[in-house]
């Protein structure tokens, strides 16, 4: 018998992880990292929208030129509320997004829920 995948003990029902992968144009990684460090992340922190962030990552092997973010939300309503606040943050949108967008080739967003085994980030 296979166990159903669902919330773990102590987890809110339907906790979601959002994996956001941004593929950059070749040669633009250093510029993108600088924008995130100088403008993007400080704007999120100032607006209080950094609390759901698990981490930022850069690809190294396989598909390269990617920046990856992992976010953790209590449920879909929490996720939607978070992104509404992010995109209402003028420092983030006008100071960062408008400068970062031309560096991007593609954006991929995956919603994930935790399996009932393994580490619990």
Where is each model-derived feature located?
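Short S/T/G/P-rich N-terminal loop/turn motif that feeds into the first structured element of a domain
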Residues: 1-121
């Amino acid at each position: 018998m296979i166990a159903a995948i669902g919330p773990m003990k102590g987890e809110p029902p339907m906790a979601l992880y959002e994996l956001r992968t941004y593929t950059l144009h070749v040669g633009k990684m250093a510029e993108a990292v600088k924008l995130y460090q100088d403008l993007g992340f400080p704007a999120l922190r100032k607006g209080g929208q950094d609390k759901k962030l698990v981490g930022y990552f850069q690809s190294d092997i396989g598909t390269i030129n990617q920046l990856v973010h992992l976010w953790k939300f209590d449920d879909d309503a929490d996720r939607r509320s978070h992104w509404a606040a992010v995109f209402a943050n003028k420092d983030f949108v006008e100071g960062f997004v408008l400068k970062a967008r031309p560096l991007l080739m593609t954006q991929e967003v995956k919603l994930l829920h935790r399996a009932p085994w393994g580490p619990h980030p």
